[in-house]
UniProtKB/Swiss-Prot annotation:
Top-rank taxon: Bacteria
Residues making up the signal peptide according to the UniProt record: none
PROSITE patterns: NAD_G3PDH
GO molecular function per UniProt: glycerol-3-phosphate dehydrogenase [NAD(P)+] activity; NAD binding
Name of the protein this chain belongs to: Glycerol-3-phosphate dehydrogenase [NAD(P)+]
GO cellular component term, pick one: cytosol
Residues reported in the UniProt entry to bind sn-glycerol 3-phosphate: 106, 137, 139, 192, 245, 255-257
Catalytic center residues: 192 (proton acceptor)
UniProt xrefs under InterPro entries: 6-PGluconate_DH-like_C_sf, 6PGD_dom2, G3P_DH_NAD-dep, G3P_DH_NAD-dep_C, G3P_DH_NAD-dep_N, NAD(P)-bd_dom_sf
Catalysed reactions listed for this entry: sn-glycerol 3-phosphate + NAD(+) = dihydroxyacetone phosphate + NADH + H(+); sn-glycerol 3-phosphate + NADP(+) = dihydroxyacetone phosphate + NADPH + H(+)
Gene3D superfamilies reported for this sequence: N-(1-d-carboxylethyl)-l-norvaline Dehydrogenase, domain 2 (1.10.1040.10), NAD(P)-binding Rossmann-like Domain (3.40.50.720)
Family as reported in the entry's similarity comment: Belongs to the NAD-dependent glycerol-3-phosphate dehydrogenase family.
Length: 341
């Protein structure tokens, strides 16, 4: 049995806590909202985020971050990407022994263009962390919480640590694969949200299955092109951390990114959509960061650019689709496998 802290009592943090508790581990879940923490401890539910999922009674929750970390050897950091830096700073002030840190967020910091593990490494002193890993893949918390079969990847440069995390989480409903390509895992998880937003938008526009299939296929090509340019293994984009994550995020109404894109496609304004969602839509931040990164790296990302124009430049979705359809003609396999071109 391991002593585990889960930082973040949202839908995904709660679902990860459930998997760990099912496997017999001692789980202490940290949340900022006293109301949610009290409900977890008294009713063993977290109805704001996972309304149909009773939780194991062994899961305990607290609003005291120091208490959550005390005596814990593994820390799962399950907060929005925008909170990774401030929360990591807090952890650095409170950690007294080195711990394994596994983050389960998907994003890129817009101002610095840093991946989330890079931010964690900056903010938490080396003496206070044993290793940094990322848990990512095609997972909806709503399905994990009711124990539907799910597969996911733990990516870590230290495969011995990854193996430990794999053992912690794996059970009959939750299968974990190993990957040493942290760069590819993080870029796959972050950049696919851009394509998922665009997929929701095509559905909202009523363009049908043909357009959505084309968007997803060409979308994985362009996010892989950027990821490989920035140091990722191209194989990661054909696995759970790439195409797998894209499929689940771009095709399901569980997906916040799909729902946000769908609403925009139906004519709603971005600010209204974000206000009504009540939860983070990571694809918006990812689009802003990727648009800038692509310019710096000299990588062509036409779908990302089109989405950026809609979200941040006020352009018409219909007009941007027309521009995509009338781009110069080319061979389909151009730059699909030869990413360096």
């Amino acid at each position: 049995m391991a002593n585990v802290a889960v930082i973040g009592a949202g839908s995904w943090g709660t679902a990860i806590s459930l998997v760990l508790a099912d496997n017999g581990h001692d789980v202490l879940l940290y949340g900022r909202e006293q109301e949610h923490v009290d409900e977890i401890n008294s009713s063993h539910t977290n109805s704001f985020y996972l309304k149909d999922a009773p939780l194991p009674e062994s899961i305990r929750a607290t609003t005291n971050l120091k208490e959550a970390l005390d005596g814990r050897s593994i820390v799962f950091l399950v907060v929005p990407s925008s909170a990774i830096r401030p929360v990591s700073k807090e952890l650095n002030t409170l950690l007294t022994e080195p711990v394994t840190i596994v983050h389960a967020a998907k994003g890129i910091e817009p101002k610095t263009h840093e991946r989330l593990s890079e931010i964690i490494a900056e903010e938490i002193e080396p003496a206070k962390r044993r290793a940094i890993g990322v848990l990512t893949g095609p997972t909806h918390a709503e399905e994990v919480a009711v124990r539907k079969p799910t597969t996911i990847t733990i990516a870590c440069a230290d495969l011995d640590v990854a193996d430990e995390v794999q053992e912690l989480l794996t059970n009959d409903q939750f299968r974990v694969y190993l990957n040493s390509d942290v760069v590819g895992a993080e870029y796959g998880g972050a950049l696919k949200n851009i394509i998922a937003l665009a997929a929701g938008m095509t559905d909202g526009l009523g363009y049908g299955d043909n357009a959505k299939a084309a968007l997803m296929t060409r979308g994985i090509v362009e996010i892989a092109r950027l990821g490989v340019k920035l140091g990722a293994n191209p194989a990661s984009f054909s696995g759970l951390t790439g195409i797998g994550d894209l499929i689940v995020t771009a095709t399901s109404q569980h997906s916040r990114n799909w729902r946000a894109g769908n609403a925009i496609g139906r004519g709603e304004k971005l600010e209204d959509v974000l206000g009504n969602m009540g939860m983070v839509v990571e694809g918006v931040r990812a689009c802003e960061a990727a648009h800038s990164l692509a310019k710096e790296a000299g990588v062509e990302m036409p779908i990302t650019e089109a989405l950026y124009n809609v979200l941040f430049e006020g352009k018409s979705p219909h007009d941007e689709v027309k521009k995509l359809m009338r781009r110069p003609q080319k061979h389909e396999m151009e730059q699909v496998f030869h990413f360096e071109e």
